[in-house]
Amino acid sequence: MTADGRSRVDDPRRSRVLASVEAHPAGDDRESQSLDEVRGLLRTLVAPFDRSGGPAHVTASAVVVGVRGVLLHRHRRLHRWLQPGGHLDPGEWPQDAALRECEEETGLAVHHPAAGPVLVHVDVHDAADGHVHLDLRYLVLGPDAAPAPPPGESQEVAWFSWGEATALTDEALAGALRSARRLIATGAVEVPGVTPEETDG
């Protein structure tokens, strides 16, 4: 039961996603605040994974890295270079939504690291539609191939060096790239063909 008396939706994703978020370390002050908000909202929202379930809901995105660098697309409405991502389909897990959205928006086949999905960053932000997005960002591996976005999606999709990507993006995504860089540098995540030194620029 929520504070306003509504019954929470019994969703098996809630406890597992909450556990993943609780285990995720904050990379900076902004992410620390976002983590606090997401933890609280995952416990109290009626339907946190449903975009029609209330003004705040979970979204998922892909921080795509590979031998060509970092993959970004220029958002058609926001006119900013961002990571691919979006809303969850009914019953979909966030890590699966991140892959699906990325493939739909870039035309590239991407996948999680061999050891499984890696939650690399969490960010809470206001969306253009007036909703609040609880964005779960996963480190995703991309192929050595040029993007081929389908008609109807942003045609501005490109690989950038790590330095270029960091300079182009907002502070939240820059934080995600810093976290990804740390995971690669420490060997926590292996990106085939990419050395820690290559993530420096």
Where are these regions (language model features)?
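Short, well-ordered beta-strand micro-motif
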Residues: 64, 139-141, 161
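Active-site segment of metal-dependent pyrophosphate-handling enzymes
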Residues: 107-146
